[in-house]
Each structure stands twice: as structure tokens, then as C-alpha cells.
């Protein structure tokens, strides 16, 4: 494919990741002001204010594959932008915690669907040699959105007085509207047109405009993969025994992604840093360092993913997780101070960006056959969001300075996450296959042959 057109389509679609990332951590700046405004209890605050968007992502991820298969990738990407926009305006203008939670839920549905459809779309238009980097653009935009949200929260703190949190949340409407308009400029996935619409003429037209050297050969390869899907997997579905290994791989990578504690740290970064001894505004500023580190090392992950491969990056990340989380736990346990703690929080973020952060959406999007890719992506994404929601829900019960179980010394939380990363390291060594540099159709044959 012509690099310029391929990259342009990928960048547009990956902007959904920017909104995903921004929305993920913007709540960290609004967390304390909302708690003080509506006098929420730790349990209510955890369920309605902090994790309601994540329950929306679970719903969106779980069922997002259905419209993605029926309506096509492009239409669903467009609706994702509409959901983002409605959520941004709704949360900024909400006058009670229930209405606020409703609009956070709407935005979460959009994020959940985007985590299904965006990686699928990019993986289907990419070539085998560029697929890792291009799908990882989605992850890059997630971390770029995270950084921009931290900067925005810091810049808007105090702006509008007690209503600064409304500006923090409402500013998301700008990229949401821009993304929605840009989606009109992309083409539909040729693989979807062939496998679901049998529209070979339109698919060939798109492949030709994108610069595919041998259009007929590309179409034949897609048709061959589609034929294999039908002949080998007529009882299509994730419960088919042929797919057990694929389902297990998607489950485990999503499970370990959240059991690293990444969303816990991103959602509660200012509060964690305050407990380490930083003032509120200093904690918001240091959150920017977390976002910046995430962005820089995501570049490293993007550079390495198609060179070293997915499995190697997961191994590197696992070792970094274990070291950093163990030392963060020690920092809280021994009261070493904010500088020591911050250093190893940044090491944790770097390990995540190079490892799980760079790999998860690429890996899930490429391991499933074309005809169940939407369902597989939905499954993996929903597992990711279920555990993200559960962790975010229970965090105030453990972390709250006044009523939390650990109050101002949450070292056992980080020790638990470190232990989970030891298990991830063992799993990667023993179970994870390498997928770099292989066409989706060849990868399907490789993984299913091992399963059988």
C-alpha cells in the first residue's frame, strides 16, 4: 500500500485512542473536587464517579463486535465519535452525580467499542511488515491522550474556580468533534467488504487506490482465508474448541494488563503522589512526568515491536514491572519519600509502555481468524475493561486517606501487583507465540494448526 494513504487512514482511526487515553485519566483531576462537591462516600465514589465509564467500556467492548461485523468498520468508528462528543458535553454540564455518571457511562461505551473496532480496522488494512507499528499507533495515541489530559488538568486547575473540573472534562469535546469529521475521509476495510459483503469490486477499488501491487493476488488471499474460516469453523464462535488457545491468549494478556496496576496508577496518580507527601498542585504537575514518560517509551515500543517482536517486548516489560512495583511497595512501606517513589513509578510506566502497552491491542487484533476477529477483539477488550473497572471500583476502599483499609500507606497494593507480574513473566515464557512479520492468513493457519 502507498505509505501516505495507509498512514493517513491509520492516524485518523487511531485518534480514537487519543480520546480513549484522555478520557481515561482526565477523571484523575476531577476526582477530589467532585468528591468534595457532592460529598460522596468511598464506595459510591468508586462505583459511580470513578468506575462508571469503565462499566460502559465493558458493555461497549463486549457487544462492539456485533455492529462492527454487521455495519462495517467505518460506520461504527463514526458512531464512536458521536458517543465521545455527547459524553464530553454531558459530563461537563451535569448537575448531580447520577447524571454525571450516566454521561461517563456513555463515553465509556464509546471507548469500549473503539478498543474493538480501531485495532481491527488498522490490522486489516496494514501489510504484515507494518502491522505492528500501525496498530500500535492506536496505543501511541492512547498515551498521547493521557499526557495531554495530565497537562490539561494541571493547566485548568483553578480555572473557573470550583468549576475547574467541568472545563477539564468538557475540553474533550474538541478532539471528539474533530475525530468524527475525519472518519468521513477513510475507506471501508477491504477485508470486511470481501468477507461480509462479497463486494469484490469495491474492495479492489480501495486496494488499488491504496497502492497494492497485485490487487487480484491480495483479494485471492483474503478469499482463501475466508473459505478456510467457513470450511473449518462452520460453528463459528469463540466457544469452538479450535479457538480455545486463541481465547486463552486474549484472556490472559488482557487480565495481566490490568493486574499490573496500570489503570490504578493512571486513575489515582495525583492521590497516590499526595499520599507520598506532595501538595495537590505538585501532584498534578508530577502526573505530567508520568504522562511524558509513557509517551517517550511508547515511541521506543513502536520502534521495537516489528523488530524484536511481541513476545520479547512482553518479557522486557514483565521484568521492568517486577522491579519497579516491588520498589514502589518498598517506598511506601519504608516511607522513603516522594523522590524515590516517583523514580520507580516512572520506571513502571516505562516498562508498561515498552511491553504490555505496545503489544496488547496489536496482539489481540491479529491472533483471531477474520470471520471471528470482531468477536475475539470484543472478548479480549471486554476482559481488559472488566478488570479495569473492578480495580478502579475497589481502589477507594483501600486507598482513601480517611476511611480506606490501608489509609496513607498502600504498599500491599503494589506488592500484590508485583506478584501478579511474576506470574505474567512465567506465562509469556511458556505460552505466548511470536506473531511479528506474518500475514493474518498465515498467522491463522499457524495458530489453529497448533491448537488442533
Where in the sequence are the language-model features?
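Conserved H-loop
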Residues: 213-216, 279
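Short, well-structured alpha-helical segments
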Residues: 215-227
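Alpha-helical transmembrane bundle of multi-pass membrane proteins
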Residues: 1-201, 205-208, 227-452
Amino acid at each position: 500500500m502507498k505509505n501516505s494513504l495507509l498512514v493517513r487512514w491509520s492516524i485518523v482511526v487511531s485518534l480514537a485512542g487519543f480520546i480513549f487515553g484522555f478520557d481515561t485519566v482526565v477523571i484523575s483531576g476531577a476526582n477530589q473536587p467532585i468528591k468534595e462537591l457532592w460529598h460522596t462516600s468511598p464506595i459510591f465514589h468508586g462505583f459511580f464517579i470513578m468506575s462508571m465509564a469503565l462499566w460502559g467500556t465493558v458493555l461497549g467492548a463486549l457487544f462492539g463486535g456485533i455492529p462492527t461485523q454487521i455495519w462495517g468498520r467505518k460506520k461504527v468508528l463514526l458512531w464512536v465519535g458521536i458517543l465521545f462528543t455527547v459524553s464530553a458535553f454531558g459530563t461537563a454540564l451535569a448537575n448531580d452525580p447520577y447524571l454525571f455518571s450516566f454521561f461517563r457511562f456513555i463515553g465509556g461505551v464509546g471507548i469500549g467499542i473503539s478498543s474493538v473496532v480501531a485495532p481491527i480496522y488498522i490490522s486489516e488494512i496494514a501489510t504484515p511488515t507494518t502491522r505492528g507499528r500501525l496498530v500500535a499507533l492506536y496505543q501511541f495515541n492512547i498515551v498521547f491522550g493521557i499526557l495531554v489530559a495530565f497537562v490539561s488538568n494541571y493547566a485548568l486547575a483553578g480555572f473557573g474556580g470550583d468549576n475547574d473540573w467541568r472545563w477539564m472534562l468538557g475540553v474533550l469535546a474538541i478532539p471528539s468533534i474533530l475525530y468524527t469529521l475525519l472518519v468521513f475521509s477513510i475507506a471501508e476495510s477491504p477485508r470486511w467488504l470481501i468477507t461480509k459483503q462479497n463486494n469484490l469490486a469495491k474492495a479492489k477499488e480501495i486496494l488499488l487506490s491504496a497502492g497494492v501491487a497485485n490487487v487480484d493476488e491480495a483479494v485471492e488471499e483474503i478469499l482463501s482465508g475466508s473459505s478456510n474460516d467457513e470450511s473449518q469453523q462452520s460453528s463459528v464462535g469463540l466457544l469452538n474448541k479450535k479457538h480455545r488457545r486463541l481465547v486463552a491468549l486474549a484472556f490472559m494478556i488482557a487480565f495481566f494488563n490490568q493486574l499490573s496496576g496500570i489503570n490504578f496508577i493512571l486513575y489515582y496518580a495525583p492521590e497516590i503522589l499526595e499520599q507520598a507527601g506532595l501538595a495537590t498542585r505538585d501532584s498534578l504537575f508530577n502526573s505530567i512526568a508520568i504522562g511524558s514518560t509513557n509517551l517517550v517509551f511508547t515511541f521506543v515500543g513502536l520502534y521495537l515491536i516489528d523488530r524484536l517482536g511481541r513476545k520479547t517486548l512482553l518479557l522486557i516489560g514483565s521484568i521492568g514491572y517486577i522491579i519497579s512495583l516491588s520498589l514502589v511497595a518498598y517506598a511506601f512501606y519504608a516511607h522513603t519519600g516522594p523522590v524515590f517513589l516517583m523514580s520507580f513509578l516512572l520506571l513502571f510506566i516505562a516498562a508498561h509502555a515498552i511491553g504490555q502497552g505496545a503489544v496488547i491491542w496489536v496482539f489481540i487484533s491479529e491472533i483471531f481468524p477474520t470471520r471471528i476477529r470482531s468477536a475475539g477483539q470484543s472478548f479480549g477488550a471486554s476482559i481488559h475493561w472488566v478488570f479495569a473497572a473492578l480495580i478502579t471500583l475497589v481502589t477507594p476502599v483501600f486507598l482513601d486517606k480517611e476511611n480506606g483499609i490501608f489509609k496513607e500507606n498502600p504498599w500491599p497494593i503494589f506488592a500484590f501487583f508485583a506478584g501478579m507480574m511474576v506470574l505474567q513473566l512465567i506465562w509469556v515464557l511458556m505460552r505466548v507465540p511470536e506473531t511479528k512479520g506474518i500475514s493474518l492468513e498465515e498467522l491463522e493457519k499457524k495458530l489453529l494448526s497448533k491448537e488442533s
